[in-house]
Amino acid sequence: MAPTIRDIARAAGVSVATASKGLNGKGRMRPETRQRILDTARELDFRPNRNASSLTTGRTYTVGLLTRDGYGRFTPPLLGGVEDSLSVDTASLLLCDARRDAVRERHYLDVLADRRVDGLIVTGRATDPAPPLPRTLPFPVLYAYTTSSNPDDSSITVDDEHGGWLAARQLLRQGCRRIAHITGPVSVLAVRERIAGARRALAEAGLELPDNLVTYGPFAEHTGFQAAQKLMANEQVDGIFCGSDQIGRGVADALGGMGVRIPDDVALVGFDNWTLIAKATRPGLSSVDMNLYRLGRLAAESLLRAIDGNPEPGIRRLPCSLAIRASCPAPITDTTEWLDDSPLVPDA
């Protein structure tokens, strides 16, 4: 026979009411008491009856996650944060991929409504504001990484301006004074915000990032390779901020082929901290980390608060951090630049 909540209460030495509060994360109690209840439930392989709970709470303990334009490189860490924050005991996650198809998106919204999900997280490949979902949906919606163009919606995204500032600061810390930037398409919001951050850091040091030292192109290795060759043939630079790790790897390959020493002659900082690329680059690529796993956790926590009736409208931004490797190894003295537990910053 499956264990009941009375069995949990008896084994943990608490009342049924206390056991219920401990399992549902409700009420005030000592942390060790709550942990004892959870440990006991795990030992007895207790599985709560969600159908019974739904009758009293009106909840289904399911949350949807809708990707509007397919699964990209940034989806897995964000998804991992969402899943770990919700956990098996809090809610199940239903994944839906709209693939840039409005009909498919509408279908999934209908399915999620029919399944009576408690809430929905919407994400995408870019941070650019996206058209909002209908506000008539019967559940709260939170936008993660991608943002809603409606300021009344709840959005959590990356602070790309801060990331650009961090990258330039690291190059300055390395001793660089003539810094170039090779990045993605100027049409991308994140590209423009990162440039603004880099220029702010350089201005604080009495320097500038002139337009002739900024190169735009696809987020690809060949962009970095070709731009670096052209740059080194015409300009004297001692640091390059790369708009992605793929671009950074292309830059490193080009510099290596020209006999340019990294970081002695030219230091490099990438963006994304895509470890598969950054660690395979020679030398290892220092990179800005967008803390996407943490962003996923924060998104799930914010959605749960909205489900409880406490929405948090507006756009909030998660600061970035640095992963230091051999391409720009200057030590960091400010620990907030490499810790990923910075608080969310609301838009002004």
Where are the language model's segments positioned?
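N-terminal helix-turn-helix DNA-binding module of bacterial transcription factors
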Residues: 1-60, 345-348
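Short beta-strand segments enriched in small/hydrophobic residues
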Residues: 16-21, 55-71, 178-185
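Amphipathic helical "hinge" segments at domain boundaries
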Residues: 31, 35, 44-111, 115-118, ...
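Hinge/beta->alpha junction and helix N-cap segments in small-molecule ligand-binding domains
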Residues: 50, 68-77, 95-104, 156-166, ...
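Flexible loop/hinge segments that line or gate small-molecule binding clefts
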Residues: 100, 122-166, 246, 272-285
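Periplasmic-binding protein-like
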Residues: 116-124, 180-182, 214, 235-246, ...
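Flexible loop/turn connectors
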Residues: 234-348
